Amino acid sequence: MKYEVRCSACGQTSHNLLYFQCSSCGKPLDMQLHFDFETRKICRNDFSVWRYRRFFPYVNRDEIITLGEGWTPLVRLSDSVHVKLESLNPTGSFKDRGSTVLISAIHELIKRKRGYISEDSSGNAGASMAAYATRAGLKAKIYVPENVSGPKYTQIQSYGAEIVKVAGSRGKVAEKACKQEPRKFYVGHILHPLFRDGIRSLSYEIAEQLDWEIPDRIYLPVSAGTLMLGVISGFKHLADSNVTKSTPKIVTCQTRQVSPLYHRVKNLSYTPPDEVTSIADALVSVNPPLLELMAKNLREVKGGAVMVEEEEILEAFKELAMKGFFVEPSSAVAYAAYTKQVMNKETSSDSNVVIILTGTGLKTTLRSK
């Protein structure tokens, strides 16, 4: 199976799976697939991300690092709405999809160099990367914002990772994590193309669980863009391979405070807040490094963007809990956006919809009552 890791700006090919940016121009790298998805190649006795291992050709089968992630339930909420319970992944969020693929692809390379990994995260990705690193026998150093959520901090710490708290913006955290040190390999989930590529397994699952009938719309929360880019890649791969007839409309959902993508696709100016205080504390990327790539991909699939208010997020959080789904407020942003569009008659309540619930409520200190 052919694939290429290419620069999203100048098009130069990278041949080193450890690289996260172009060696020529410094811009982000992107995974390009040059093979079809074939349903006959699904490993049907495997109910994890690695059910689709034949579509991740850069990972050696005997080097896979897994905690049983993926194949999460797709639960019917109403006649036309399903929710995808990514909160039931091993570390409690969708980030495990990216971590299993990235760590599986590179852990032996890092071990041969006697190195360790570094990552920057507001919580979920740090916890996920720490878990898969320890599973692989790698040391991990996780850089987190000074105001990181208590439960997420505890989770990262429990996996044995070294934690470095960084004052200042989310960008400052990434800057520290990227800083070169002996034997340190930066595997930041935002910039590393293999992490984003691992997320496309989510699209394969949704399609297979719906018997390859694509929903009209997918609602998902957006911060740095790894989820939306991975989901778009997966659905495009299925459509390009003629497994599905089309791609769904991807609806990206953001908070008013953190809405750079919403403003970009609406051609509006965006002024980020001095401090992010939203209850959706996993959505913090006010200046995402992949913003241009996000906007380009969203336009290509004729996607949409919705911005929600704090009170709408809180109401959605409470409503989901009363339906039996205890998710973190950042997940509730997607449900809030869906209900807002139905109320405003921007979508039909009869449209077939999948809402991705990205993380567990066990990681939040917010209460539904």
Question: Can you annotate each of these PLM segments?
Answer:
Residues 1-369:
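PLP-dependent amino-acid enzyme catalytic core
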